[in-house]
Protein backbone atom coordinates (compact mmCIF):
# COMPACT_ATOMS: atom_id res chain seq x y z
CA UNK A 1 0.00 0.00 0.00
CA UNK A 2 1.46 3.37 -1.02
CA UNK A 3 1.75 6.39 1.24
CA UNK A 4 -1.20 8.03 -0.56
CA UNK A 5 -3.40 4.97 -0.15
CA UNK A 6 -2.40 4.68 3.51
CA UNK A 7 -3.19 8.37 3.99
CA UNK A 8 -6.60 8.04 2.30
CA UNK A 9 -7.56 5.03 4.43
CA UNK A 10 -6.32 6.77 7.59
CA UNK A 11 -8.38 9.89 6.80
CA UNK A 12 -11.47 7.76 6.26
CA UNK A 13 -10.91 5.92 9.53
CA UNK A 14 -10.46 9.28 11.29
CA UNK A 15 -14.04 10.12 10.31
CA UNK A 16 -13.69 11.99 7.01
CA UNK A 17 -16.09 10.84 4.31
CA UNK A 18 -15.02 8.84 1.26
CA UNK A 19 -14.57 11.85 -1.02
CA UNK A 20 -12.66 13.80 1.61
CA UNK A 21 -10.37 10.85 2.30
CA UNK A 22 -9.30 10.56 -1.34
CA UNK A 23 -8.96 14.28 -2.06
CA UNK A 24 -7.26 14.89 1.28
CA UNK A 25 -4.64 12.24 0.59
CA UNK A 26 -3.58 13.89 -2.67
CA UNK A 27 -4.24 17.57 -1.93
CA UNK A 28 -0.74 18.82 -1.28
CA UNK A 29 1.06 17.04 -4.14
CA UNK A 30 -1.72 18.33 -6.42
CA UNK A 31 -1.20 21.93 -5.28
CA UNK A 32 -4.02 22.39 -2.77
CA UNK A 33 -4.00 22.59 0.99
CA UNK A 34 -5.42 19.56 2.74
CA UNK A 35 -7.85 21.81 4.61
CA UNK A 36 -9.25 23.22 1.36
CA UNK A 37 -9.48 19.75 -0.19
CA UNK A 38 -11.37 18.42 2.82
CA UNK A 39 -13.76 21.36 2.71
CA UNK A 40 -14.47 21.43 -1.02
CA UNK A 41 -15.05 17.69 -1.31
CA UNK A 42 -17.24 17.16 1.76
CA UNK A 43 -20.51 17.46 -0.18
CA UNK A 44 -19.51 14.63 -2.51
CA UNK A 45 -19.43 12.05 0.30
CA UNK A 46 -21.91 9.19 0.60
CA UNK A 47 -22.83 9.37 -3.06
CA UNK A 48 -23.19 13.18 -3.12
CA UNK A 49 -24.70 14.49 0.06
CA UNK A 50 -25.78 11.03 1.21
CA UNK A 51 -28.05 10.62 -1.83
CA UNK A 52 -26.22 7.37 -2.63
CA UNK A 53 -25.55 8.34 -6.25
CA UNK A 54 -21.99 8.22 -7.66
CA UNK A 55 -19.61 6.94 -4.99
CA UNK A 56 -17.90 9.86 -3.26
CA UNK A 57 -14.47 8.27 -3.65
CA UNK A 58 -15.10 7.97 -7.40
CA UNK A 59 -16.25 11.61 -7.52
CA UNK A 60 -13.03 12.53 -5.73
CA UNK A 61 -11.04 10.93 -8.54
CA UNK A 62 -12.82 13.20 -11.03
CA UNK A 63 -12.16 16.27 -8.88
CA UNK A 64 -8.48 15.37 -8.64
CA UNK A 65 -8.24 14.79 -12.41
CA UNK A 66 -9.47 18.32 -13.00
CA UNK A 67 -7.12 19.72 -10.39
CA UNK A 68 -4.14 17.89 -11.88
CA UNK A 69 -4.81 18.15 -15.61
CA UNK A 70 -7.01 21.19 -16.30
CA UNK A 71 -5.79 24.71 -16.88
CA UNK A 72 -9.25 26.03 -16.06
CA UNK A 73 -9.67 27.89 -19.34
CA UNK A 74 -13.22 27.62 -20.73
CA UNK A 75 -12.24 27.38 -24.39
CA UNK A 76 -9.40 24.87 -24.01
CA UNK A 77 -11.21 21.82 -25.26
CA UNK A 78 -7.98 19.82 -25.46
CA UNK A 79 -7.43 19.81 -21.70
CA UNK A 80 -11.14 19.23 -21.12
CA UNK A 81 -10.95 16.19 -23.41
CA UNK A 82 -7.87 14.98 -21.50
CA UNK A 83 -9.66 15.34 -18.15
CA UNK A 84 -12.78 13.57 -19.41
CA UNK A 85 -10.71 10.73 -20.92
CA UNK A 86 -8.79 10.15 -17.69
CA UNK A 87 -11.99 10.32 -15.62
CA UNK A 88 -13.56 7.70 -17.91
CA UNK A 89 -10.49 5.45 -17.63
CA UNK A 90 -10.30 5.76 -13.84
CA UNK A 91 -14.03 5.17 -13.44
CA UNK A 92 -13.84 2.11 -15.69
CA UNK A 93 -10.98 0.71 -13.60
CA UNK A 94 -13.01 1.18 -10.41
CA UNK A 95 -16.18 -0.30 -11.93
CA UNK A 96 -14.34 -3.33 -13.27
CA UNK A 97 -13.02 -4.09 -9.78
CA UNK A 98 -16.15 -3.23 -7.77
CA UNK A 99 -19.03 -3.91 -10.17
CA UNK A 100 -20.54 -0.41 -9.93
CA UNK A 101 -19.77 3.24 -9.28
CA UNK A 102 -23.14 3.84 -7.60
CA UNK A 103 -22.96 4.19 -3.82
CA UNK A 104 -26.31 2.47 -3.20
CA UNK A 105 -25.27 -0.53 -5.30
CA UNK A 106 -21.86 -0.72 -3.63
CA UNK A 107 -23.49 -0.67 -0.21
CA UNK A 108 -25.99 -3.37 -1.15
CA UNK A 109 -27.43 -4.86 2.03
CA UNK A 110 -25.42 -2.41 4.15
CA UNK A 111 -27.49 0.49 2.80
CA UNK A 112 -29.60 2.10 5.54
CA UNK A 113 -33.34 1.64 5.00
CA UNK A 114 -34.23 5.24 5.83
CA UNK A 115 -31.86 7.77 4.31
CA UNK A 116 -31.44 11.12 5.97
CA UNK A 117 -28.76 13.77 5.82
CA UNK A 118 -27.46 12.57 9.19
CA UNK A 119 -24.18 10.67 8.77
CA UNK A 120 -23.86 7.38 10.62
CA UNK A 121 -21.62 7.16 13.66
CA UNK A 122 -18.27 5.57 12.89
CA UNK A 123 -18.21 2.40 14.95
CA UNK A 124 -16.53 -0.97 14.55
CA UNK A 125 -19.82 -2.30 13.14
CA UNK A 126 -19.93 0.56 10.61
CA UNK A 127 -16.51 -0.35 9.22
CA UNK A 128 -17.28 -4.07 9.29
CA UNK A 129 -20.51 -3.95 7.28
CA UNK A 130 -19.53 -1.43 4.63
CA UNK A 131 -17.26 -1.66 1.60
CA UNK A 132 -16.28 2.01 1.90
CA UNK A 133 -12.72 1.53 3.17
CA UNK A 134 -12.04 -0.73 0.20
CA UNK A 135 -13.55 1.81 -2.20
CA UNK A 136 -11.36 4.57 -0.75
CA UNK A 137 -8.32 2.32 -1.05
CA UNK A 138 -9.15 1.39 -4.65
CA UNK A 139 -9.69 5.01 -5.67
CA UNK A 140 -6.43 6.14 -4.08
CA UNK A 141 -4.57 3.40 -5.96
CA UNK A 142 -6.28 4.38 -9.21
CA UNK A 143 -5.48 8.09 -8.74
CA UNK A 144 -1.88 7.23 -8.10
CA UNK A 145 -1.73 5.02 -11.19
CA UNK A 146 -3.38 7.50 -13.55
CA UNK A 147 -2.48 10.93 -12.17
CA UNK A 148 0.73 10.86 -10.17
CA UNK A 149 3.56 11.93 -12.39
CA UNK A 150 1.12 12.80 -15.18
CA UNK A 151 -0.37 16.05 -16.33
CA UNK A 152 0.55 19.61 -15.62
CA UNK A 153 2.94 20.62 -12.88
Language-model segments: which ranges?
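Structural signal for hydrophobic packing residues in well-ordered secondary-structure cores
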Residues: 12-15, 26, 30, 48, ...
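Glycine/serine-rich anion-binding loops at beta->alpha junctions
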Residues: 16, 44-63
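Phosphate-handling active-site elements
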Residues: 29-39, 65-86, 151
Amino acid sequence: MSIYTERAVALFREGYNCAQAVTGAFAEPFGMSQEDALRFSEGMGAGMGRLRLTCGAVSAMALLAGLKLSNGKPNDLATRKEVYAVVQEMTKAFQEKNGSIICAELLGAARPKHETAQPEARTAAYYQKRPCVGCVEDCAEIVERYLCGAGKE
